Structures are given as structure tokens and as C-alpha cells.
Design a protein with these regions (language model features):
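Short alpha-helical transmembrane interface motifs in multi-pass membrane proteins
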Residues: 47-51, 79-84
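Small-polar-interrupted transmembrane alpha-helices in polytopic inner-membrane proteins
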Residues: 13-18, 80-100
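"…centered on the first transmembrane helix and the immediately adjacent amphipathic helix/loop
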Residues: 1-67
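Membrane-interfacial alpha-helical segments at the cytosolic side of multi-pass membrane proteins
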Residues: 56-72, 117-132
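Membrane-interface helix-boundary motifs at transmembrane edges
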Residues: 1-3, 71-79
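Terminal transmembrane helix and immediately flanking juxtamembrane interfaces
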Residues: 1-22, 110, 119-137
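Interfacial helix-loop-helix junctions of multi-pass membrane proteins
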Residues: 93-116
Length: 137
């Protein structure tokens, strides 16, 4: 029960963080990405890569937290995986819709796919780690 509460709390925290980032106007969002530019200034299109990597990573963490939350319930592992991916996809859609109402931001279907891919990747890596004898949590 403690693990369930922990993972649900982590999921809600990540969702809140995503919502916060999506609430930032275009200029503020760009400044957040540009913070990392000095480290990667030699890479072409570094700002674009930073933003897309952030999408992949934060939705990967969300997918992982969804999977861990669902795995505390008495349901099959395949069902946990599928439901986690569906939840990531749904939250990615809602995130892009939210961004479309934010000044200087837009709704991009490609980001929904990237977010879902990030979530799916983290979920699959977690299940492979567990299958190889890693921790169950």
C-alpha cells in the first residue's frame, strides 16, 4: 500500500511538472531550453534537441511512474504495460491541447508521438530490467 501511494504521488508530481512547463509562454519556454545551450553550443539545432529530449525524458518518467503505480494492483503485467502506455498517450494529447491555449505555444501531433514513445521506452526498459532479475520497484 505504501508503494502504491508513493508511485501515485510521483505520477501526480510529474503530471504537475508537465502542466507547469506547458503553462509557460513561448518566450519563457525557449529561455528554459536555452539555459542548457552553452553546454551544447557546438551542436547544430541544440535548442530543438534539448526541447525534444526533455519531452522524451519527462514522459518516459511519467510512463515509468504509471507502470509502477499500476503494478501495485492485482492485474497482469501486460495489462499494466498497455494501460500505462494508453495513459501516457492520453496525457500527451491533453498536454498538447493545453499548450494550444498558451501564448506563443502550439499543439503538435509529433510531440504526442514523441511523448508516447518516451513513455513506452521507459516502460519497456523497466520490464526488461525486472525480467533480468532487477528490483520489482
Amino acid at each position: 500500500m505504501k508503494k502504491r501511494i508513493l508511485w501515485i504521488t510521483i505520477s501526480l508530481g510529474i503530471m504537475s511538472l508537465i502542466f507547469y512547463f506547458s503553462s509557460q509562454n513561448g518566450e519563457t519556454s525557449q529561455q528554459t531550453s536555452d539555459f542548457f545551450l552553452p553546454l551544447l553550443q557546438h551542436i547544430p539545432n541544440a535548442s530543438f534537441l534539448i526541447r525534444k529530449t526533455a519531452h522524451f525524458t519527462i514522459f518516459g518518467c511519467l510512463g515509468l511512474s504509471y507502470y509502477q503505480s499500476l503494478s501495485t494492483f492485482p492485474i497482469k503485467k501486460r495489462t499494466c504495460i498497455l494501460l500505462s502506455i494508453i495513459l501516457v498517450f492520453c496525457y500527451a494529447i491533453s498536454d498538447e491541447i493545453h499548450q494550444s491555449f498558451t501564448n506563443g505555444r502550439s499543439c503538435q501531433l509529433s510531440d504526442v508521438f514523441l511523448d508516447t514513445f518516451g513513455g513506452s521506452t521507459y516502460i519497456i526498459l523497466c520490464t526488461l530490467y525486472q525480467k533480468r532479475g532487477g528490483s520489482n520497484s
